[in-house]
Amino acid sequence: MEKVKVQDAVGMVLCHDITEIVPGVFKGAAFRKGHIIEEKDIEKLLDIGKENIFVWDLLDGYVHENDAAYRMVKAAVGEGIALTEPKEGKINFLAKFPGVLKINLEALYEINADEQICFATIHGNKTVTEGKLLGGTRVIPLVVKEEVLASFEETCRKNGPIIQVVPLKKAKIGIVTTGSEILNKRITDKFGPVLRAKAEELGAVVVGQSFSGDDKNVIRDQILKFIEEGVDLVEVSGGMSVDPDDMTPAAIRDCGGEVVTYGAPVLPGSMFMLSYVKGIPVVGLPGCVMAAKRTVYDLVVPRLLTGEKLTRRDFVLLAHGGQCQNCERCVYPDCGFGQ
């Protein structure tokens, strides 16, 4: 840092905010810390009484914080991310459209191992709305060495985007509703309306709902019928416990395909099941999905609707943060559930 006359400061980096006060009209920063002094700034600085200022000289091999931020977002940001203009060297990330936020955690940790880098995000694998603040980046010093940025860019080249929003598909969903009491109209189906509302929330559409009773073969055949009709997801509601009449898990297994999990370390929603039949996800939904505001459904189904292929490992990772706190006022996804 050095003190120089404003006439000699062109091309140098301002070390501090410079305040301008116009009584009754304006009080604020005329120039922000990190601003690179231009020829046109000299008269303005003199007008507000600044004949000398503290600056950094931008030496060869160093990059100004604003330019560094632009380079970092170019290297690290994937689809679905809108950027703010740099302010004091920081650029924020906003969601361009509704979708599921994906963060490459290992790469995120690797780039932040350098103490001159700040790249912060909210938790990933959650639904976000258009305009949602997702994170931001900056370098810590006003100027940073070129090799620091080169290392950052190389990490991004090796790992792909650090942050991106994957859009939700305009998915077609088929619902198979189990339970003899519903088939025989002893009670009104309350699961279907809940699932339709959740589908609408995710931009999907329920193209059909069938009622199977508790016959394993009927449940199986109705699942396969929806798949043959070209749905993107089959949701089987109810029949997921160990009661003798609960046949959903056996029916899903009888469809063939790959069972990913029967059981999830999530409360509510531990009796959840996921299988892929002819490449189409089939989920078995426990009764809590109908009764509770947020459940395992909200942690898993949005990811399925982006086309992500889930594994048992994905479910294991839900354990940390898998307990919903049943808050009186639900603010999901802006809470710790699923994080």
Residue ranges and their predicted role:
Residues 1-149:
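Phosphate-interaction motifs
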Residues 7-11, 29, 83-86, 126-128, ...:
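Solvent-exposed alpha-helices and their adjacent loops that cap or buttress functional pockets
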Residues 51-54, 81-83, 90-92, 132-133, ...:
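Structural motif
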Residues 77-79, 119-122, 156-163, 222:
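Glycine-rich, charged/polar anion/phosphate-binding loops
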Residues 105-106, 146-149, 187-188, 245-248, ...:
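Short acidic, glycine/serine/threonine-rich loops at helix termini
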Residues 143-169:
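Short N-terminal or domain-adjacent regulatory/targeting segments
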Residues 159-214, 218:
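Glycine-rich phosphate/diphosphate-binding loop of Rossmann-like nucleotide-binding domains
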Residues 180, 207-338:
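Short glycine/threonine-rich loop/turn motifs
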